[in-house]
Structure formats: C-alpha cells, structure tokens
Amino acid sequence: MSGVNEIRSAFLNYFAKNGHDIVPSSPLVPRNDPTLMFTNAGMVQFKNVFTGLEKRPYHRATTSQKCVRAGGKHNDLDNVGYTARHHTFFEMLGNFSFGDYFKDRAIELAWNLITKEYGLPKDRLLVTVYSEDDEAFGLWKKIAGLPESKIIRIPTSDNFWQMGDTGPCGPCSEIFFDHGDHIFGGPPGSLEEDGDRFIEIWNLVFMQFEQVAPGNRTPLPKPSIDTGMGLERIAAVLQGKHDNYEIDLFQALIRAIAELTGADPQGEQKGSLRVIADHLRAASFLIADGVLPSNEGRGYVLRRIMRRAMRHGQLLGAREPLMWRLVWALVREMGQAYPELVRAEAMIEETLRLEETRFRKTLERGLTILDEKSGSLKKGDMFDGDTAFTLYDTYGFPLDLTQDALRNRGISVDIASFTDAMDRQRAKARASWAGSGEAATETVWFGLRDKLGATEFLGYDTETAEGVVTALVKDGKEVEALKAGDAGAIVLNQTPFYAESGGQVGDTGVLTGEGVRFRVTDTLKKAGDLFVHFGTVEEGTVKPEAALALEVDHSRRSSIRANHSATHLLHEALRQVLGDHIAQKGSMVAPDRLRFDFVHQKPITQDELRRVEDIANDIVLENDEVTTRLMAVDDAREAGARALFGEKYGDEVRVVSMGKASREHGSNAFGWSVELCGGTHVRRTGDIGLISVTGESAVASGVRRIEALTGRHARQSANAAMATAKAAAAELRTTLDDMPARIASLMDERKKLERELSDARKKLAMGGSGAAGAADGGADVRDVGGVKLLARAVEGIEIKDLKSLVDQGKKQLGSGVIALVAKSEDGKGSIVVGVTPDLVARFSAVDLVRKASEVLGGKGGGGKPDMAQAGGPDGSKAQAALDAIAAAIGG
C-alpha cells in the first residue's frame, strides 16, 4: 500500500466496508456557494447537508476531494516550493456522518484505519482535543489506549471549528505523527510546536453545537462528523518521507520535468522543479473543471498559478512552452482516480501551451514598460511599488522579474508600497467573493421544499393544466394571501411552466381562477426542484389551496423550444467542423435569440461559421423526429450522450436525440445529436424553421461564443440584412453581385489617397521637400560642437511617420543627429531621435531622447543607441525639448 493511488483506494474502501457511500469529488468550482472561490475542503459539497438545507439519500459518506488553496484567506501559493508541505492543489480524504454516528464511532474508525489498515506504530501517534472536551479525552484513552500524556488539551480555537459567525460548530481532535527526535520540534501546545517533528495527519470535527449568536451555543439535535486527512501528508508518512514532495506521485512528475529541462532534481533548482510539479496539478485540474485563465476571479488565480510555474520553467532554462508537455505525466499518475483529467487532456495541453506563448509576449512587453518607467532612475534609487504592482497585476509581469531586471542597475523595488497595493487588491477580491447574502432568503425555499416536496412538472407534454396553490411568498417570507397589485411568488402542486435551468429561461403566462388573475413574469427553481412562479396579481386575491388554471404563453414557449433545439444542433455541428475538443461552457436560450459558449482557443473563420450553419440547417430541412427517453445516468453516458461537465444529474436523466444516427458524424445509435437535457424541445427538427448565426466572439481566454436566431426572428433578420445590402448597392451604384468588388476598389483607392496625404504631410512638415531638403543645408541643420544636428518641431505627424522621417534624415546627413518632435491634437508631445552609425559611440539616442522627454513632462524613453523614442504630456515645450538635446550634444 505504498503508492498514493493505493493509499487513496484503501481509505475509500475501508469506509465503504463500514457503511459509507463513496461520493465522487465535487468540482473545484463550488456549486451554488458564492462565498468560496475554490473548493478547499472535503466538507464543502456537504455544507447544506450539515446545515439542514439539503437532504442526501445516505447518512454516511466518504470522499477523496480535490482542493485548491490559492486565493482568499486560504492562500498557499507564495509558500509553494519553499516548504515541505505547502501545495496549491491537494487531495483531502474524509469521512462524514450526517446525524448518524458521533465521537465514539468516529474515533474508533479513525484509530483502526491508521493503526490496522495503514499499520502506523501506535507509539509514534498522539492526539489533541479541545480543552473542554472531556468526552473526547476519555474516548481516546478508552478506544486507542493512549496514555494521558499523549492526549493533549488545546485551549485555543485551533481545536474548535466554526462554519461562520452562526451555524454548526464543535470541538476538534487532531491526530499527529512523530517523525522522530532527529528532527527539531515539540508536540502541539509546546513552545517548539512550530517545528517539523510532529505533523498533523488527520482532523476530526465533532459538530455538536449550533452557534446562535456570539457566545450563545445550543446542542444540535443530531450531532455530525466531518473529518479531513491530507492525502499527500499521509502518503509521506506511509512512505517513510518527511517531505511531501518526496512521495511517489511528486517524484514521478519531477522526473518528467527534469528530463525535459536537464535540471538536477536534488540540485540548486530543486525548488523550481517542485513549483512546476505542484502548479501543474492545480492548473490542470482547474482547467478540467472549466476554469480558464483570465484577468479576474478564478481565472485570474489560475493565470497567476500558471505564470508562476512558467517563470520557474524559464529559470530551468526552458526556451519553449514547457508545461503542456508534462500533462501526459500527470494523466498517467492521476487519470485513473480522476477520469475528468483524461477527458480534458487535449484541452489542458492547448490551454497551457497558448498561455505560455502569450506569457512570453508579456515578458517582452513588461520589460519595455519597465524600461520606460525606470528610465530616469539612477543607481541607488528605489522603484515605485505601486508601479511594480501595476506591472504585476495589469500586465502579468512578476515582481521577482521586476527585481531581477532592476538589480543589474542597482535599483531596488519599494516592497512596502507594493505590499500595500497587493493588500488593497486582495481586500477588493475578498469583498467581491463575500457572498450575496441570499442564504437567509433561500431558507424559506428549502423549508417549503421540505414541507411540500418537489413540484410535479407537466410541461413536456402540455402548456395548460390545473393546479392548487400550496404556498405564497412575498418579500422573502411566506404569506397567507397576495392581493391585487402585489408582486410575489406562487408555488403549485404541479405546473406546465418550465423553471429556468440549463440556460433556458423560465416560462411566462397567466394563472386564473374565480375572480383571480396572476401574471407570471418568470419561473425559477428553488431548493433544487421547487418550481416558483414570480409575478403580479392583476385581479382578486390569491390564497393557499386555491384551484387555478395554468396557461403558458404558447408563442413564447414555441420560440424557446426552437432555440433550445437549435443549440443542440449547433453544438454538434461545431464539433464536426472544429473538432471533438468542443465542450459546452454555457448557453442562453431565450424566445428571441440564443447564444452558445464553448471551449475553443482561436476565433472561428467565416468559412467555418458558414459550414456550421449549413450543417445545422441540413438537419432542420430533414425534419427528423426529436426523441426523448429516460435512462439511468451511467447508461446514458456510456451510450455517448453529451453532458455539461460539473452539472448535477439525478440517477435518472432525460436524453434528447435529433438527426439521423447514420449521418457521417453521428454521436451514437440514438441519433446525430444526443445530449442529457431537461429543457423543452421541438417535436421535429423542421419546427425550428431556420437557423441563422449572427455573431461570433470571445468571452474569455479559450472560450468562444456564437449567437444565433431561429424561425421568424431569423427570417426577419435576413430580410433586414437584404434590405440594407440593396440600399448599400444603390448608394454604390452597383449590383448586389458586384458590390464586393466595388467596395474592394474603393478601399484600394482610399489607401492610395491616404499614402499620398501622408507623403504630403511629411513634406509640409519638413519645409516642403521632405527630410532630404531640410537636411541638405536647410535652416534647421546646425553645427553643435562639430556635430550636425537636424532638430525640428513638426505638426500632424504620427509616431511611425516620425521614425520614417528620422531614418531618411540620417541617410541625408551622412553623419549627425536628427531629432523630431510632433505635437498631437490632445497636446501631448512625441519625440524620435536618430544617431548615425559613426556617432553612436559618443551619443546614445536613448540618453538624448530621455533628456527631451523630461522637458515634455515625461519619464524615460526606450529604443536602441541609433534610434529611440519617448513622449510627454506637454507638447507645447517642443522647442525646449530640442534645445535640451542640443545642450546634451554640446556639453
């Protein structure tokens, strides 16, 4: 049982034998929990079970949970690579009891696992208990036979767990392993407890109280158990290692990195190897769970992780993208336990490759900006920390690289102000993740769900029905009546109204009864499967137990059905045209339009869009029957039905199929497009009428979006487009067929005129004959200390044209310096300085342009010794800037 995979399996199988359901790891992006950026503990997916808001079909569970700690208060990112046990990604083994067994059984199960199944020597184990938890103290003594000296009472909050200011809470008991007296450190609670000798391997939380208010706790009627054991830590113990990075899983990854880079796993670059191994795991699992690199939220944290790893790849000498070439090694080690890693392997590789390619461009851009911002600084000066943070936060330019680049010039970074800026950013990020405060209002829905049960949905077969009012809600509270003019919500025993889910908007319509009319403006799901009808009472008073006639807006529902079925066809068509890596990231199905978001790393060409549209419309024209069937979820997936990753499905699922399975790109025997879907659909594909793709765009890095119309909306859009095209053709005095050629001709003519205008501006700026005339003994050429200087302020010239004029001037001067300053419409000044080859040993264009930039109010400048550019906010001082250059040459 020495390998990580064997240790994980042994844990799960042990608890399964002891009556626990093995529950798969939840995604790293928490479902329905806006308070967390990432899943960071095993209990996260059971949070609502512990609080009583959710019920599961089991009372005991065991998991191996994927966790990430790289944001918010749980942030291990900066420590990774420098300690033996910090990770951004880790696995947490756990067992849970929801009102079933409690302390005695939890302690017995834990002790038997580590001493009998895992075989740890009892004399190297000790435990802690909360100082007031006499019960746990006695149970450890009785069950484990531990002497009192090895049952340590801890009076601090380290051994008392709370979910928040209110909610379930209780004492903890931690199990520690003694690595031996050859390692510094004392037992928990001692002065030397921060040493590495005694390492916590398992934490048992005994949830036995309800925190009603600060200082006010009441006993829970059904105490529960939540435990967590870091897989990497227990693996290190079982493999006789004191360092998590020396376990078999990490060593396999480190060997793969070393083979690609030539680095010595035990040499000076050991830290970089560890960073890459850890960050490879975090980045790969986050991408597999649907997170993609971006500049905000979860995507921003992922980007930080990836770029930190890529920077360490550079330190190892990697000159080409490295991380994507390591994914295979991770899949080999962890793919069996986490099949989502196997499914997403190609996407992970492509995302890492593209991000590292972009990062190299970021490095180049960052160095240029750094040069400009630090140009006026001298040896011994300090670089502004706010600017360093802007480079880091806005441009992705790492602080350590900023420090390295400035160190050669004897310039340090103001770390204090950088840290202040970082703290401000973190505070802002924490505030954005502080949650929406909806938990209290959601309680009413969970309470109604417990009391009333699930709503029976009739809408697959009908748009009209009769129902009985079972509850009324107004302003987040259950009420006994809704009167005319009241805005509120109605819960019914059954309904044909579809509740918003899976990207499909909720139905609208009317509920009518004797003297009563309620206009439904939206239908939403609450507490899982409680259908709630939101709207306004137009007539009468609605009361519980009233019988109502329920009528969905037929025209709106028909349009929604067409758009939802069209998303399925477009999804499959995209896979056929672009490849099987296409995976849905989201959708919006409304009555008047649809959009579909999917994983793809580059823009879709117009030809590809046309092919996608044509393929989807071919299925529409075939007018095939759309079939639905109920299947066991495992059978449906095995049959090839596509599912939205991370979506929660029940044991039985609805499978929607359309198109002939015999088509070239058929999904399986059920049809051409086969997906798990709970939405409403057309009866035949011909009911869609027409699919018109209206746009394609980027949503985030690696995520594209297509938008489309169907049916009459598509027809109206096509008619409007045709009318616009005809009007444009008339203006151009040509036909529709000849219009593209006519436009191309006009564009060529425009480019020609723009070139002529640019040439004219250059000549005018240089006195009517261009740089040559001005340079050839013109009034603007003067002798400064034996050096010819052509210096002139010009109007209306862009920076790229300034460079061109300076190049011409250098050629005409033969030997000398040319400086041109242009004032823009907004009053800013731009300056370009050129030095002929024979003078670059005496004068650097970079030094000269920086002198001028200071006069214009700018800082720094950049370029090469023979050509440099800069700018400043005050273009009115153009002549003074040129005089500063002359003074520098003459000095």
Swiss-Prot record:
EC number(s) on file: 6.1.1.7
GO molecular function: alanine-tRNA ligase activity; aminoacyl-tRNA deacylase activity; ATP binding; tRNA binding; zinc ion binding
InterPro entries in UniProt: aa-tRNA-synth_II/BPL/LPL, Ala-tRNA-lgiase_IIc, Ala-tRNA-ligase_IIc_anticod-bd, Ala-tRNA-synth_IIc_core, Ala-tRNA-synth_IIc_N, Ala-tRNA_ligase, Ala_tRNA_ligase_euk/bac, DHHA1_dom
TM helices/strands, residue ranges: none
Gene Ontology BP term (one): alanyl-tRNA aminoacylation
Reactions it catalyzes: tRNA(Ala) + L-alanine + ATP = L-alanyl-tRNA(Ala) + AMP + diphosphate
GO cellular component: cytosol
CDD domains associated with the record: AlaRS_core (cd00673)
Compartment annotation: Cytoplasm
Keywords, sorted A to Z: Aminoacyl-tRNA synthetase, ATP-binding, Cytoplasm, Ligase, Metal-binding, Nucleotide-binding, Protein biosynthesis, RNA-binding, tRNA-binding, Zinc
Cofactor binding, per record: Binds 1 zinc ion per subunit.
Role summary: Catalyzes the attachment of alanine to tRNA(Ala) in a two-step reaction: alanine is first activated by ATP to form Ala-AMP and then transferred to the acceptor end of tRNA(Ala). Also edits incorrectly charged Ser-tRNA(Ala) and Gly-tRNA(Ala) via its editing domain.
Name this polypeptide is given: Alanine--tRNA ligase
Species classification: Bacteria, Pseudomonadati, Pseudomonadota, Alphaproteobacteria, Hyphomicrobiales
The gene coding this protein: alaS
